[in-house]
Amino acid sequence: MTPEASANWFSLCWFAWIDPILTAGYTRPMEKDDLYLLQPHRCSEHLGSQLLAALEKRRKQRQDYVEANPNKTDKPAKIPPLMWAMNDIVFRYFWIGGLLKLLADVGTITSPLLVRALINFGRDSYNLRGDRDQAPNLGSGVGLAIGLFLVQALCVFLNVHAFNRGFGTGIILRGALIQAIFQRGMNLSTRARTVGGLGVSKLVTLISADATRIDYAGQFFHMAWTSAVQIIICVALLIWSLSYSALPGIAVLVLMSPIQTAITKRLFALRKKSMVWTDKRNKAVNEVVGGIRVVKQFAWEEPYSVRIAELRRKEMSFHRVRLYLRSLNLALAFATPTIATVLSFVTYALVGNELDAAILFSSLSFFTLLRTPLQFLPIAWNAIVDAKNAADRIEKVFDAEIQRDQIIRDCSATNGIQLEDASFTWETAQAADTAKPVNEKKGQDSPSNEKETPVDRASTLDSLNLTVPRGTLCAIVGGVGSGKSSLISALAGEMRQIAGKVTLSGSTAVCAQTAWIQSTTIRNNIVFGNAFDPERYRYVLEVCCLLPDLDTLADGDQTIVGEKGVSLSGGQKQRLNIARALYHNSEIVLLDDCLSALDARVGADIFANVIAGDAMAGKTRLLVTHSLNVLRSCDWIVHMEEGRITEQGTYAELVESKGRVAELLLTHTKDHFEEEKKEPSKHPIDEIQETAESILDAGSASNRNSEASESTTTTVNAESKDTSNAEGVTNKTEKKDLVAPPAQAKSKALMQDEERFSGSVSRTTYLSYLNAAPLSILLPLFLVAVLVFQGSTIMSPVWLLWWQNGHFGLQQGVYMGIYAVFGITQSLGLLSMGVIFSTFTIKSATTLHHRALQRVLHAPFSFFDTTPQGRITHRFSKDMDTLDNIIGEAMRTLIGTIVQVIGSIVLIAILTPYFLIPVAVILVLYFWIAAYYRSTARELRRIDAGLRSNMHEHFSESLHGLVTIRAFGNVDAFIAENCRRIDKQNRAYWLAQTCQRWLSVRLDFLGSLLILSVAILVVASRFDISPGETGVALSYILTAQSIFGWMIRHAAELENNMSAVERVLHYANHIEQEKPYHIPQVDDALEAREWPERGEIRFEGVEAKYGSSERNVLDKLDLHIAPGEKIAFCGRTGAGKSTLVTTLLRTLELSAGTITIDGIDIASMGLHRLRSSLSLIPQDAVIYSGTLRYNLDPLDQHEDATLHDALQRTSLTDLSLDMTITEEGGNLSAGQRSLISLARAMVRKTRIVILDEATASIDQETDVQIQEVLRNEFDGITTLTVAHRIQTILHSDRVCVLDKGVIVEIGSPAELWAKEKGAFRALCDSANIRYQDGEWK
């Protein structure tokens, strides 16, 4: 627990309770374990609950007001309920901070009154220097000096603790908001996530950007009103000091106020405009990184780089103007008091007043002190406006519709699943099966209200009647887009039920079509928050065929599989998915086409042993499948079309009815209805007709005559279950040490730890950042601007002193004019510094963004396999935002303060040389304290950045797996984990902010000692220095003392923020790169001869391995593929099929051997030339949000006619090119996503086409059409097909069977099938494929 909870008042005052952390960080690099635990009332779970309760209360108050005042509710509340709720949970803590800030500001602004008294003391003493006995008592001067010191010291403590509460409020609200957003996000309805626009990327933006803006506003909120109080008091005191002469200066303040307000508004407008492009750029980067495999395999790196660069250019065009305007605003804020001072003093002199030193220099102090509130007032209001808009955006999450479980769960129900006239709707932005383009009218995407929303379009699933008794296996079949997966989603509670009744007998587990895998260990993915049972766990591994896979992994089940399971094959991910559902031990298991990603043999084992076997015996199972050969083992079969159940019944009943299922079986069945003995004497061709007849006649022999009707509820005969194929687990893998005992389980991370630098930021980092801009031009200009600004700043009070003394005997007008010139040049110098550094910031940030993006786009796949997507996108969002908005300004301010510190020391030392003694001592203390602080602060910032990324990764990953998490009932567990990660990050964040307060209280207290030393010196030298010189020294140190502290703080803060530069530079300079993208001489020659001309491929002695592994995944492989040949690759998961494809695309480089295409070694050419010459249809379809046209042709290179043709050839004619596709293709079925991926490849005209499990998620009827298209359209095109579904490759010219990276068989399908003990024949037997089942070659 943090020592703050038990610290005494002195320790709390000085923040001494954090000393142990600072000592630890000073002596060694800090680690996460060094961080203190948060106090319970600061934990996110507590805060999130408080916020949600306060929000509910405020909304109820608003609702009561609306009901009581129906005529006053036309306009929305000026302050939204969320902001009131945030105020409620921090009210006491926050507003006590406001009171402290007010007292500190009042004390600061009245300090010049003591300065005036000291100057009067010095004047009286100086005037009586000849008669020192009559001079004022030294004690009174010392008393005034001590009084000034005490006021300043008190203001230091008040100010630091006010800021501490402001920063603390920001942290509290940020943690509460992230937790509340996550909790709400995990319960949002599908409608809210699609139509409401609250998808994963939007919610991530809310926690990373909007919650941070509210955090930032907490730090500056009180300045918005205390600054106004300061200004009012200061103006009143100026009128008291200068009488009516102060009015011209005050008029300047009044006149400049609307100008600064207008600039602030313009800054806000520019911020909003730039954020539009920032969001677009971040979204583009996110989509490119998320779909990097497609980008690289299609050689789209350069077009996407150009696209992102153009978005960046538009973003920076607004950002450039914004930075220039901000520089102007700061210059005006600095210049306004100076101009006001000049006008007031000139007026004061013109009306005949004597230039009294006490009046002049105390008034000068008032005007100078005005700079702080004038500078921070627009910043504070800008932060508040930003926060208000952020709160408005966040509140939409709490306004949005939540998932309402209308499903009845009755553990005593006889039936496992019962649907009675049930209708469901997705209510997405665009129906997946409609050809109508989206109507993009204004307001269409507005978030839904939490109240139930009327249905405004046809439901996706209509009037479903289905009864599945407990313990039965029900298969769902139908074409692509028929509603099969939607039915699974409906039963999982993801679709909105609009009619009818749904009853389930217990808990559910879901196997989604696309397996959601966490970036954690294999064990954690399977156990998924349940209690660990070693025996059951091992049994699950065995029946799901995972033990052989664990045998190949060095860490067994403790292997971390990476983000989205990147280290696993598609089959392994799906088996992990099935294992998770099996281990969960739910009453009902919903399986959405989970066999399609498995090879034939493994799929047959999984089906026999798990789905239809003992493993899931007694459970109610709903299996969506395209594998019609498994239907005989199912108790009940349902056929769907256009969201309706068109047929249902037992296998025999459906065959007898001669409906749609019988038609499918007639064409594609893999076995007879009755088990027949094989007759070797018959020629396979002669059996085809007999098979067709037996299918249609089998039903007549059955005694079951019941018919399935879509309007009549039909009950499955629970006793009809055929368990003949449930043979149990055979040939169990010998138990090896693949499953680590819980006490010894240690995972080896596949994901690389986030790059964390230790020690101080290197000189190389600063130089690299500086050299990213044209420094040779900007540096001289900046030095000139600094000299002009600082020279004018120093000379301004000196000239005022000379004017007061009449030093040169000049006319009053000359003194006035020169004094005014110094004021103007100060402003111009500051403006020039701001503009030059803004230009530097833009140039440097743009250059580093471009370099980092280029390195990422050309990084090898291994980089993306071991680096979470969230971490990569974080570099281009949060870290790049730091470069855009913070680093340049921090560097400019640091340089400015260093120059001001030097000028202050020189000026005061000229007046009182002994000042060099205390300032030297205090500067040593400054730098010692800073050195003691900076190592800890730097490490805390780095730890905070790492933990922040970790929290964001979990947030994003969880929302991507929302359907699975909700189906398994694990929402609470993930919410608790999110709390844990927020708290872990806040432990570092809170300590980092507290360390800054520790530094501030010490530096500012030393600044008060500087004031004391100058005051004592001028009191001690009262007979030797004039009142004017006393005034200059005191007024200058009063404002300059804070600059000493700011110099150290800015140096530390700059170093802390430079960690973002370190990370971006790591991406810009040190990411491993692929082989050359272009080899101009070779590539140009190949392009000139239109290579490849024929499509002939040769693999000669090919060896390949992943990473540092010693095992070859391809071992001395030799293969010749003739031009135009159709060759298929099959084999068990992990046999090397997909690896073969990766070597052809060179996403995995060979360790030995060569691959040639048309006689050219592919290693000799650039990657762009190679990959752009091939077409790949990948296993996992990558779909982007946007239009269908954009997904087919993201680079806009083809005519619509070409795109329509591709849609027609892939049976997607029901879709419009202008239809909107939601995030990750959420409004498309998995089959439709695969078909779009296929159509995308068809748009490219290449001589070689690769299909990597491209049709696994497509029903067999559509698959037949696609295969026909591939045969006809790709005639003469070399085609390589990787498939688990054996029947899809029977028409291939040759089949190559791989095992452990070696070709074990190769030949035509017919030749290999004839080998009764061959590997291919075994795969066919596992899939129940017989000769008459396909078009054999």
From Swiss-Prot:
Residues 432-460, 699-751 are annotated as: Disordered. PROSITE patterns: ABC_TM1F, ABC_TRANSPORTER_1, ABC_TRANSPORTER_2. Residues 438-455 have a biased composition (Basic and acidic residues). The gene is fer6. Glycans are attached at residues 71, 187, 465, 731, 1057, 1227. Belongs to the ABC transporter superfamily. ABCC family. Conjugate transporter (TC 3.A.1.208) subfamily. Induction: Expression regulated by iron through the urbs1 transcription factor. One of its GO terms (molecular function) is ATP hydrolysis activity. It is a multi-pass membrane protein. Keywords: ATP-binding, Glycoprotein, Membrane, Nucleotide-binding, Repeat, Signal, Transmembrane, Transmembrane helix, Transport, Virulence. It comes from Mycosarcoma maydis (Corn smut fungus). PANTHER family: ATP-BINDING CASSETTE SUB-FAMILY C, MULTIDRUG RESISTANCE-ASSOCIATED PROTEIN LETHAL(2)03659. Residues 1-23 form the signal peptide. One of its GO terms (cellular component) is membrane. The keyword Membrane applies. Gene3D superfamilies: ABC transporter type 1, transmembrane domain (1.20.1560.10), P-loop containing nucleotide triphosphate hydrolases (3.40.50.300). This is Multidrug resistance protein fer6. InterPro entries: AAA+_ATPase (IPR003593), ABC1_TM_dom (IPR011527), ABC1_TM_sf (IPR036640), ABC_transporter-like_ATP-bd (IPR003439), ABC_transporter-like_CS (IPR017871), ABC_transporter_C-like (IPR050173), P-loop_NTPase (IPR027417). CDD domains: ABC_6TM_YOR1_D1_like, ABC_6TM_YOR1_D2_like, ABCC_MRP_domain1, ABCC_MRP_domain2. Multidrug resistance protein; part of the gene cluster that mediates the biosynthesis of siderophore ferrichrome A which is contributing to organismal virulence. It comes from the Eukaryota. The keyword Phosphoprotein does not apply. Residues 95-386, 781-1056 form the ABC transmembrane type-1 domain. Pfam families: ABC_membrane, ABC_tran. Residues 417-667, 1097-1325 form the ABC transporter domain. It is found in: Membrane. The chain crosses the membrane at residues 94-114, 138-158, 220-242, 247-269, 331-351, 359-379, 769-789, 817-837, 890-909, 915-933, 999-1019, 1028-1048. Residues 700-718 have a biased composition (Low complexity).
